[in-house]
Each structure stands twice: as C-alpha cells, then as structure tokens.
C-alpha cells in the first residue's frame, strides 16, 4: 500500500519537465540519498566483513587448538614407540629393510635357567665364586685352640697366595651343587641307569663349560646300587633300571684346571633306609669335624667308626648295626690326581700320618648292613691311567692309538667305556686290556658287599687352608 501512494504523489513530475529550481533540488536530494545509500552500504559492508573476520578468527583459533592437540598426541605416540623399540631388538623399517638405531639397555647379571645350562663362569663374571663352609680347626691334643690362624697376618698372606687355586675348587664345587640339585628334581624309579648318568653328565659338562683338560668331568658318574658300594657305572647295552626299593650312591666329580671336587650322596625312595642314610651322613660330618692340620689320619678313622656303629637300622623286620666298610676310605686329592697318596680310614687302626697345611681331602664314609668289607664284582667300567707310569714301549698300533686318545682326552683322570664310545672309539676292548696288562692303565671294577646287604655313602671335599678349613662342596642339601 505505502508504495502505491508514493508513486501517485510523484506522478506529475514523472511525465512532464521539472522547473530548474526543482531540478536542482531533485539533483541535490538524489545526490544526498545516493551518498547516504553508499554510507549505509559501507556500514553494512564493514559489519559483514567484521562478522566474517570474527567468524574466521574463531575458526582459526579452534583450528590452532586442534593442531596443537594433534601434535601433542603425535609426540606421545612417538615417545611410546621409541620406548617399545628400546625394549625390542629393532624391526626392519618397511620395504627399505633399514634397522632403526636402538639404545642398548644395560643387562643385569645372568641367572641360571631351568634346566640348568648357563656355565658357572658366566653366572659369576667377576671370577669370584661362592665359598664353601668355613670352619675353625679343631683344638690340638694339648688343648690349644687354632683360632689364632684366622687372625695371623702370615697365614692370611699364605692363604691369599693360593686364592687362585681355592677359586678353581669353588667354581667346580658350585657346578657340582647345581647339578646335584637338578638331578634330585627328576631322578625316579623306572629310569635306566644309562639314562640317569647321561642326563647328569650332559648337565655337568654345560655348567663346568667342558674344555679339554682345562675343565670337565673328573671321573665317571658312579651310581652303585644296593650291596654295590662304589665304582659302578653302566657300560653300553646295560639295561639296569632304577627300582623303588633300590639304594643308589650318586658319586660324580668336576674339575677346573685339575682341581677336583669329589662329592657323593645317596638316593632312596623307600623311607625304610632313612636311618642308614642318617648314620652315614653323621659319620661323614664327624670325619670333616675331626679333620685338620696336624691331625693324625688314624684319629679321624676312629671317630668315624664310633659314630657309625652307634646306629642301628631296621629293614624289612631285621635289625642291623650299621658297619663302616673297612676297606674303603677317604683320600688326599692332587692336581689331576683323584687319589694323591694319603688315605683317610673310616675305622680305627689306620696310619698315624698327619694331615698338612694346604692339602685337599675327600672325606667319605660308607655304611653297610652286610659284612662291612667289599670285593671286586661284576663287569669293569672305570679305568684310570697310572699317574706314576713312565715310558712303556707299545708295539700294537690299536693300543698306541687308544693310549693317545686317553692322553688327549683324560690324561690321568678316570674314564669309563661310555666315554670312549662317545669319542667315536670302537673295538677297543683288546687294546684297553693290553694297556691294563702293561700297567699303563689301571682297572677299577665295582666294589660290592655280600648280596642282600645295603650300602650308603656321603662324601665332601675339604680344603686345609692356612687360615681355616673349608668344606668347599657343602650345600643346602648335605
């Protein structure tokens, strides 16, 4: 409506000419209106621009925030990836196959695996191995104490001078401890004796890090059963199986640079033998307690017998006094020499020879429900080159070859037929017999008490150090 009325009022001027004054007024008014319109447009334009600018500012602010957040999260992801890469071994970088450089993590000390496979020398990289049980020497016969040895500067210096030797014994002893702990975790009735010995020896070789004559097994694994007291290990083809009622003596040795650990224990499954084992263990510990510098060997034997015979054991309704096996004994140990000359009796009436400073002894006792005497029996499996033998001329080529094999692999340490088989030797029995006949090699057949009797054994290696006595093979087990 308003638009129609406005058009009507201007009707006269639209078709006719305007007066000059009217034209000037019209021109000026139209110019003013045009200027006003321009100003309004500018204002509108400015308002629109400022609104757009504000909108853009808002959007750009949000965008900056979003970008900042993305960068932050990306940085976190990269950090996590780097951490993961440090833990891992580093994967190939896509198709290029390039490996990223990783920061090496510091490795902690090695720990033993299960089953044991890490050599003892790798578990103790500083080369210092765990000591055995250190004991004060027993008082002398006139009642004087030996405590002064532990504080004497002279004795300390002497002890330190032989530290390398003691350390070799300790390394071999730690291997022995770990192997026997492993054996006790799996030995059970139903296993063949060959299976038991080979599993034990394989583990022992790994832990001692077998290296020719520098480190390895000191003698074959004895696994004598029941009335057999010592020196039995199965030959190839032996089908003997361990039974629930068997009493098995596990006697094995390790060495580092010829420093031998000779240590043994008895395994049973039937508790009826418990007292027999207690008697023999007690007798061995008594022998260890009595041993010392300037102690007479016969006095050690007498103390052992007294303790052993104080025990009675009932087996299958029969009562037996536990008897020490009088023709078996402990012995001194030398470098690469399991029996170094001195014997430690386990009954009274032995030699009056004295133990000396710096010597190493295997203190072992055997208890029996039989006669208390052993004899050679069964097929021989243990052999050892005679330590004192000189040059003996050998004519037969096979015998010469076998002696070379023995010299290279065992030297003067004991060995068994299984170990010759393992080296690839065959048809060697005649050559071995020839070496025995010539006195170059000595056979050590199994030693047995009467049939139907039961025998037990415990043994430790002791070091007669200048300052103290160290039961180097002592463990938590015995």
Swiss-Prot record:
Record-level GO BP terms: protein processing; regulation of translational initiation
Enzyme class (EC, first level): hydrolase
Any Gene Ontology CC annotation: cytoplasm
Gene Ontology molecular function terms on file: aminopeptidase activity; initiator methionyl aminopeptidase activity; metal ion binding; metalloaminopeptidase activity; metalloexopeptidase activity
EC code(s) of this entry: 3.4.11.18
Family, as annotated: Belongs to the peptidase M24A family. Methionine aminopeptidase eukaryotic type 2 subfamily.
Protein name: Methionine aminopeptidase 2
UniProt organism field: Mus musculus
């Amino acid at each position: 409506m308003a638009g129609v009325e406005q058009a009507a009022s201007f009707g006269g001027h639209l078709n006719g000419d305007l007066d000059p004054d009217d034209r000037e007024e019209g021109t000026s008014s139209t110019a003013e209106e045009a200027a006003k319109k321009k100003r309004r447009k500018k204002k509108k334009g400015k308002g629109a621009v400022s609104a757009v600018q504000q909108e853009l500012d808002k959007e750009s602010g949000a965008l900056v925030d979003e970008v900042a957040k993305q960068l932050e999260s990306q940085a976190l992801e990269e950090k996590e990836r780097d951490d993961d890469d440090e833990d891992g071994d580093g994967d190939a970088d896509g198709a290029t196959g390039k490996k990223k450089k990783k920061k090496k993590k510091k490795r902690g000390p090695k720990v033993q695996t299960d089953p044991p496979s890490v050599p003892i020398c790798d578990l103790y990289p500083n080369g210092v191995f765990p000591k055995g049980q250190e004991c004060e020497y027993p008082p002398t016969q006139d009642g004087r104490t030996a405590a002064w040895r532990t504080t004497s500067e002279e004795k300390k210096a002497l002890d330190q001078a032989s530290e390398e030797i003691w350390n070799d014994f300790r390394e071999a002893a730690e291997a022995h401890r770990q192997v026997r702990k492993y054996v006790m975790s799996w030995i059970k009735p139903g296993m063949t004796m060959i299976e038991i010995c080979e599993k034990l020896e394989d583990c022992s070789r790994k832990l001692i890090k077998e290296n020719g004559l520098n480190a390895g097994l000191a003698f074959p694994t004895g696994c004598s059963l029941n009335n057999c007291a010592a020196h039995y290990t199965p030959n190839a083809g032996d089908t003997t199986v361990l039974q629930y009622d068997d009493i098995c003596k596990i006697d094995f040795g390790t060495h580092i640079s010829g420093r031998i650990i000779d240590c043994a224990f008895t395994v049973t499954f039937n508790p009826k033998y418990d007292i027999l084992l207690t008697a023999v263990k007690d007798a061995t510990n008594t022998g260890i307690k009595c041993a010392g510098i300037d102690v007479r060997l016969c006095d050690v034997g007498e103390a052992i017998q007294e303790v052993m015979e104080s025990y009675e054991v009932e087996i299958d309704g029969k009562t037996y006094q536990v008897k020490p096996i009088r023709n078996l004994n402990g012995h001194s140990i030398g470098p690469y020499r399991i029996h170094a000359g001195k014997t430690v009796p386990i009954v009274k009436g032995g030699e009056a020879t004295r133990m000396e400073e710096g010597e190493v002894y295997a203190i072992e006792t055997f208890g029996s429900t039989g006669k208390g005497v052993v004899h050679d029996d069964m097929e021989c499996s243990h052999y050892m080159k005679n330590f004192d033998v000189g040059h003996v001329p050998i004519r037969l080529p096979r015998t010469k070859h076998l002696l070379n094999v023995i010299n290279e692999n065992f030297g003067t340490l004991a060995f068994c037929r299984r170990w010759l088989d393992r080296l690839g030797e065959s048809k060697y029995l005649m050559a071995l017999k020839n070496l025995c006949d010539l006195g170059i090699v000595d056979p050590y057949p199994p030693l047995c008490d009467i049939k139907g009797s039961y025998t037990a054994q415990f043994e430790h290696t002791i070091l007669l150090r200048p300052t103290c006595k160290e039961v180097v093979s002592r463990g938590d087990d015995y």
